[in-house]
Amino acid sequence: MRVLLSNDDGVHAPGLKALADAFEGDEVWVVAPDREQSASSHAISLHRPLRLFEMAPRWYAVDGTPTDAVYMGLNHVLRGARPDVVVSGINHGPNLGNDVLYSGTVAAAMEGALLGVHALAVSLACSPPHVFDEAARFAVALARRVVATQPPAPLLLNVNVPRGPVRGYRFTRLGRRTYGNEVVEKTDPRGRKYYWIGGEGGPTNEDIPGSDCNCVLGEGLVAVTPLHLDSSHDAVLQGLRSWTVPGYEKEPAL
């Protein structure tokens, strides 16, 4: 099995190393950001050149975002030798609920799916200290299942693994997490103001049965959540079709 690994914690992150070690015996390629890129979402570098550094055989760093790294991996490093699966992670912390909108880990996997390759985003959903062995083993087992099944369309799975031995898993939907809206204002030694967004403390998780948040944080199970590349809101679309905008002609729905 040919595997492309990436992440958003950077090419030297221990979660990435644990994932590469767990795929021992497979053809593993690593193309990852050269530094920490957490919460970079799906940013891509279109207005500056990228640099690619070969750190070791089949192990590359890109001075860009997680999306840049996977794009470079599929369209340059592995051009003509398409991988069977892209795996992003292991993230140092959870990517649950609306975290996926901000996550560079999820974005790296999503870029793989957008480019036609089955992809997994894998996160260790706990605070430090991080021990990645169980999450890495589960990721490998799930990746093998995906490759063996070969779904007809590129599959994108968001995986969150709790701390400790894996005692079970569940296929889930996304939950909802609420973060603080505080903006903390401070002053640097030169008298200039600077700001931290989000404030202090962790998120509040809504109690939604069947959600990834409940599964991981409430029950201690691995959550595997399929994500969809089409962000259209079909239920709202049906309602909008009855609207009229004054002064403009509405064309028939297709």
Swiss-Prot record:
Cofactor(s) needed for function: a divalent metal cation
Database matches in InterPro entries: SurE, SurE-like_Pase/nucleotidase, SurE-like_sf
Domain of life from the UniProt record:
Bacteria
Does the UniProt entry include the keyword DNA damage?
A: no
Q: How is the cofactor bound?
A: Binds 1 divalent metal cation per subunit.
| Class of the enzyme per the UniProt entry, highest EC level | hydrolase
Location, primary (coarse class): cytoplasm
Name the species this protein comes from.
Anaeromyxobacter sp. (strain Fw109-5)
Can you tell me which residues bind a divalent metal cation?
Answer: D8, D9, S38, N91
Family statement? Belongs to the SurE nucleotidase family.
| One Gene Ontology term of the molecular function aspect | nucleotide binding
Taxonomy, top ranks, is:
Bacteria, Pseudomonadati, Myxococcota, Myxococcia, Myxococcales
Where does this protein reside within or beyond the cell? Answer: Cytoplasm
What EC number(s) does this enzyme carry? 3.1.3.5
Q: Which SUPFAM superfamilies match?
A: SurE-like (SSF64167)
- What PANTHER family does this protein's entry cite? 5'-NUCLEOTIDASE SURE, 5'_3'-NUCLEOTIDASE SURE
Q: According to its UniProt entry, what is the function of this protein?
A: Nucleotidase that shows phosphatase activity on nucleoside 5'-monophosphates.
* Catalysed reaction equations from the record: a ribonucleoside 5'-phosphate + H2O = a ribonucleoside + phosphate
What Gene Ontology terms describe where this protein resides (cellular component)? cytoplasm
Q: Does the entry feature the keyword Plastid, yes or no?
A: no
Q: What's this protein's name?
A: 5'-nucleotidase SurE
